[in-house]
Amino acid sequence: MDKNISVMLSVVVPVYNVEETLDRCVDSILKQGVDNMEIILVDDGSLDGSPALCDAWSKRNERIKVIHKSNGGLSDARNAGIEQARGEYVTFVDSDDYLEEGTYKGLLDWLSKNEACDILEYPLKHIGTDKRITSRCTDMQFASARHYWFATEAWEHSYAVNKIYRRTLFEYVRFPIGRVFEDIYTLPQLLCKNPHVATSSHGAYCYVWNEGGISALSSKNVVSTKQHLEALMLAAKTMETRLWSSNGYKIYLSMLYRQLDIYGMSGEIVLKWPLIRLVCWLHNKLR
């Protein structure tokens, strides 16, 4: 792509050992009906045929560029893409997922008419062999980032992938290296900049459920569950979420459930709440 051409949207796609799904992912992005878009494929040290597929795509379409790097994990790959992004807006797609056709076109058309918007969230579908659950969004603009945080219980849908962000929001924000549930860490940092946030019912991001993935295994893995709890704790602190805040108690319930899981697996207490050890012990005995 000519460097003098204005780029509306940068799509960052981390790639790691996904030769079976990469073509579907990239093809779905190219079918979005957006010309002034760049696709950044970040090969994160793949050991299969993914690097060659990335290079083949870049030769076939000038809007696609490739970064080859040593393995650093999902956050590191996203960060590498952010560093190279030139678009007014940036978004993320995981390489085993895909988009409904025309999703970006409709969202960018809306953004061009609502230039004050900094973060636009759209529907996400969980797709698997036995489930298809849609995370719906209504057409709404929020008075403040905190209003969005509480009104939508954003900690429950902090996914990085079903949102379009003004790229400048990431000027001093990056995804945390070496952590799972990295999205829960990152979204509050962006919201602290008090961006204008909106949600849209248009289109869908199709998240392909993987029974062997982090989300599926988190409740069975004490390390992942601890990191989930720690992410929720930091998110609540960053967004000044009090127990008595509107809907705020729900994030504390999520913390409690993670703590109960951790105690059941390892007997460890992470939350420093009064009587939490007794609550965990009773729950473990009575379940």
Which residues make up each language-model segment?
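Short aromatic/hydrophobic "clamp" motif used to bind/position activated sugar donors
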Residues: 90
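The conserved acidic donor/metal-binding loop of glycosyltransferases
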Residues: 94-98
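Flexible acidic/His/Gly-enriched loops in nucleotide-sugar-dependent glycosyltransferase catalytic domains
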Residues: 103-177
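A conserved acidic beta->alpha catalytic loop
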Residues: 28, 43-52, 70
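C-terminal subregions of glycosyltransferases and related glycan-biosynthesis enzymes
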Residues: 159, 208-287
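Glycine-rich, basic loop-to-helix element that forms the pyrophosphate-binding segment
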Residues: 69-85
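N-proximal low-complexity "stem/linker" segments adjacent to membrane-targeting elements
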Residues: 1-31
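Conserved nucleotide-sugar donor-binding catalytic segment
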Residues: 146-221
